[in-house]
Design a protein with these regions (language model features):
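A charged, aromatic-enriched C-terminal amphipathic alpha-helix characteristic of glycosyltransferases
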Residues: 157, 441-471
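Membrane-proximal helix-turn-helix segments that form the acceptor-binding/catalytic region
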Residues: 219-251
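Short alpha-helical donor nucleotide-sugar binding micro-motif in glycosyltransferases
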Residues: 370-375
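Aromatic "clamp/platform" in nucleotide-sugar-dependent glycosyltransferases that forms part
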Residues: 383
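Conserved acidic donor-binding segment of nucleotide-sugar-dependent glycosyltransferases
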Residues: 415, 419-426, 435-440
Length: 485
């Protein structure tokens, strides 16, 4: 029976909010209908945004509380000149002449002999700078560290709780200063000492990310609450940095996608004239292309941290399990190397599979390059990537990546050089592996295309050279990165 005609003057019926997904299991997301089932989706989204905006305006009107004292402030201030002088005495004797341009890197972590993995990608930048004739000092600000100076792979590093980095800036003129993963504990000790220096903030993701990007990593309400508070603090922090007279001359993002995403996450605009895009460098000499044998399409490599679910360890396990019952499985050789909270997923799933090697350990760059030469396919699912350095390194070596269309991935790969599944699409990952194994010509064609893509986009001449020009450390077209691109 047809519905009776609506009487003139009667308002149209309100569209109901979409029904909740009642599928059991944790998915990390709520539904607009969880606000209340008497609201439309538009009403629910509007009330959440506007009420949230009012609360944030009140919160951000209050100055941020200062960092808690370390208890060493007076000692550090008194000792900083001596520590810096001792550092210079050792570093200057080993570096280039006084006419070489000087550059200071400020970070929270830097590699040591005991921990060679701490911000290794920053160290690779430093080595390229040194090779180009730049004198580089590295200042590590760690509020829990004992001040010291050490050398790592030809780089002189000064560690302190903040006073030492400020003393470096007051004592020596640098052509440029770069901070990676800028957070309040790095910013507060040096902000006043940056006067007269060209300062650049490198935006990799962690420092300007909203809690929802990593929601799957939170398992309790307390963890979610802490993550939300942390996001609010970051949003307030970046407003302070943007407005500070000694704030960054440029905010350097590793991808165009991350420039857009960071502005959405921090709910502010990084002015176009103060931003640049410079991708993380890939060492194409170490990760050099060696033509693949067609049989290497059956040799699959996963080498990555499994510290959180954004790295997709669970997706990789499920994709491989889908191939276990196919005729391809007996021809496959899978190598899984890594560590982290979720690495046990591999150990549990493949304990009885003779063709799957699972090793819980970290590997150095040289060994990763050797592993690349032995394999043909790089399984690298993801839920969030601002670039994807491990994927690009594998591509440079000629491995074909099998990944997800998440974050900035499409900025660095396409269907000519990678198998790209939708977000969370395990079947798509398995199908990508299957297609490569069933078509040797496709595998070889994509292998060559993957290596060519990296050399045309993220090799040193397209990254480090651009970066040095941007910061006035080398000649370049206008001394600029891809700002406003």
């Amino acid at each position: 029976m047809a519905a009776p005609p609506r009487r003139r003057g009667t308002p149209p019926p309100r569209p109901a909010a979409p029904a909740r997904d009642t599928t059991p299991g944790y998915r990390g997301y709520l539904h607009l209908a969880d606000v209340g089932d008497t609201y439309t989706s538009q009403e629910a989204a509007t009330l959440l945004q506007l009420e949230n905006a009012v609360l944030k305006r009140r919160l951000f009107a209050e100055p941020a509380p200062p960092l808690a004292p370390t208890g060493h402030e007076e000692e550090d201030l008194a000792a900083a000149p001596r520590r810096v002088a001792d550092h210079f005495a050792r570093a200057d004797a080993a570096q280039l002449g006084d006419d070489a341009p000087r550059h200071l890197v400020v970070v929270g972590v830097y590699p040591t002999l005991e921990n060679p993995y701490g911000n290794g990608f920053v160290h690779r930048r430093v080595k390229y700078f040194q090779a180009a004739g730049v004198r580089v000092d590295v200042a590590v600000i760690d509020r829990s560290a004992e001040p010291r100076s050490y050398e790592y792979d030809g780089v002189h590093v000064l560690v302190g709780r903040g006073a030492e980095a400020a003393e470096l800036l007051r004592t020596r003129h640098y052509e440029s200063v770069a901070a990676h993963f800028l957070v309040r504990s790095l910013w507060e000790p040096i902000q006043d000492a940056l006067a007269g220096h060209r300062f650049f903030a490198y935006m990799h993701g962690f420092e300007s990310r909203r809690w929802i990007r990593t929601v799957r990593n939170h398992r309790t309400q307390g963890q979610v609450d802490d993550a939300i508070v942390d996001t609010l603090e970051r949003q307030r922090f970046w407003r302070e940095v943007l407005d500070h007279p000694h704030g960054p001359e440029r905010f350097v993002f590793v991808s165009r996608w991350w420039r857009r995403a960071a502005q959405e996450d921090m709910e502010l605009v990084f002015p176009g004239q103060r931003t640049a895009i410079v991708h993380n460098v890939i060492d194409t000499d170490l990760f050099r292309f060696v033509p693949k044998d067609p049989e290497q399409r059956f040799r699959v490599l996963w080498v990555r941290s499994a510290a959180n679910l954004n790295y997709g360890a669970d997706l990789a396990v499920r994709a491989l399990e889908r191939l276990r019952d196919t005729p391809l499985w007996d021809r496959m050789q899978v190598t899984v190397i890594g560590d982290g909270k979720h690495f046990g997923l591999f150990e549990e799933a493949f304990a009885d599979d003779a063709n799957v090697t699972v090793e819980r350990r970290f590997v150095v760059q040289e060994e990763i390059a050797a592993l690349h030469r032995e394999h043909g396919v790089f399984l690298v699912p993801t839920r969030l990537d601002s670039q994807g350095v491990s994927r690009d390194e594998a591509m440079a070596s000629g491995l074909v990546p099998v990944t997800n269309d998440a974050g900035a991935v499409r900025e660095f790969v396409d269907e000519d050089c990678a198998m790209i599944a939708d977000v969370e699409d395990v079947a798509g990952l398995a199908d990508g592996l299957r297609r490569l194994m069933e078509d040797p010509d496709l595998f070889l064609r994509m292998s060559r295309a993957a290596a060519a893509r990296v050399r045309a986009q993220t090799s040193p001449e397209h990254t480090v050279d651009q970066e040095m020009a941007l910061m006035g450390l080398a000649a370049g077209p206008g001394g600029r990165g891809e700002e406003n691109a």
